[in-house]
Structure formats: C-alpha cells, structure tokens
UniProtKB/Swiss-Prot annotation:
GO terms for molecular function: transmembrane transporter activity. The lineage of its organism: Bacteria, Bacillati, Actinomycetota, Actinomycetes, Micrococcales. Its main location: membrane. This is Nicotine metabolites export pump subunit NepB. The efflux pump is composed of NepA and NepB. The gene is nepB. InterPro entries: Small_drug/metabolite_transptr, Small_multidrug_res. Keywords: Cell membrane, Membrane, Plasmid, Transmembrane, Transmembrane helix, Transport. The keyword Oxidoreductase does not apply. It comes from Paenarthrobacter nicotinovorans. The keyword Transport applies. One of its GO terms (cellular component) is plasma membrane.
Length: 166
C-alpha cells in the first residue's frame, strides 16, 4: 500500500473535522468564492441554516393550515380526494416541522407552529365561511400572537446569554 493511500483516510477525517468546526463557528461560507462576489461578505453558514429553519417552519404552518381548510371541505371524511389531500398536507407539515427543529428550539417551534396555525385557521374561517369576528375572538388571537412573540424574545435572550457565557 502506498503512503498516499494510507494518508488519504486520515486526511479525509481531518478535512471533515475542519469543515465541521468551520460550520459551527460560522467561518465556512463567510466570503463568497465565485469571481463575481469576491471579497463580499455572506451570512455565516449557521445563520443561513437558522434562516432556512424558519422558512421550513413557515412552510409547515402554511401546509398545516391548508390541510385544515381542505379537511373542512371533506364533509367528515366522506370525500376521499379532500381527505387524502388533507392527510398528505398534514404529513408534509410534520416533515417540514422536523426540519425546522434542527435549528429552532422545540418549545419555540411547536408554540409558533400551533399558535400561528390556530390564528391562520381562525382567519380562514372568517374569510371562507363567514364566521363571526367578535371582540372575544380578536382578543384571543391577539393573546396567542403576543404569547408567541414573548416566547420567541425570551428564547432569543436566553441563547444570547449562553453565547456570552461561553
């Protein structure tokens, strides 16, 4: 066996470890590599990963709400096409939620997903079915949104405090 063949696995492991370290510290992808953007800063990889997670979460909320609205048109599971579409959208929503959980804490992701989904379904009910918009409903929706905002702010501050301690 040549010395090159023996060094290749070790070099591969070292390169892998270096890449992981760069991803964790945000060094990877911080400067654009292509000629058109040479020297221009890009967001560190972890920040982009977090942005993607929030996009996954937004998509999960959208698919869950769409599934719920379609489920309402299934007439109690009597219409197979609407029932199948709703179940497929629910499954896809859970898939997107699990992708979001890679970078968003569970408590924040689930509260945001379920809370904003509830708010969106309430709006859909008012728009599609003409459900009454009462002061009580508006107050409840405002409370849900306020709770989600407070939870997100508290979690962001907690993560910032942890980073300063390290």
């Amino acid at each position: 066996m040549s010395s090159y063949a023996r060094r290749t696995p070790v070099r591969t492991v070292l390169n892998f470890c270096t890449a992981i370290r760069q991803i964790i510290t945000g060094e990877a992808g911080s400067v654009a590599a292509d000629k058109g953007n040479r020297g221009q800063k890009r967001a560190p990889l972890l920040h982009r990963h977090r942005l993607h997670a929030w996009l996954y979460l937004g998509s999960a909320i959208t698919t869950e709400v769409t599934g719920t609205v379609i489920l309402d048109f299934s007439e109690g599971f009597q219409l197979p096409a609407q029932t199948t579409a709703a179940m497929a959208l629910y499954a896809f929503s859970f898939f997107l939620l699990t992708r979001a959980l890679r970078a968003v804490p569970l408590s924040v992701a689930y509260a945001t997903w379920s809370g904003l989904g509830t708010v969106a379904v309430a709006f859909a009910g008012a728009i599609i079915h003409g459900e009454a918009v009462t002061l009580g409903r508006i107050t409840a929706i405002t409370a849900v949104i306020g709770g989600i905002v407070i939870l997100n702010l508290a979690t962001t501050r907690q993560h910032s405090a942890r980073r300063k301690d390290v």
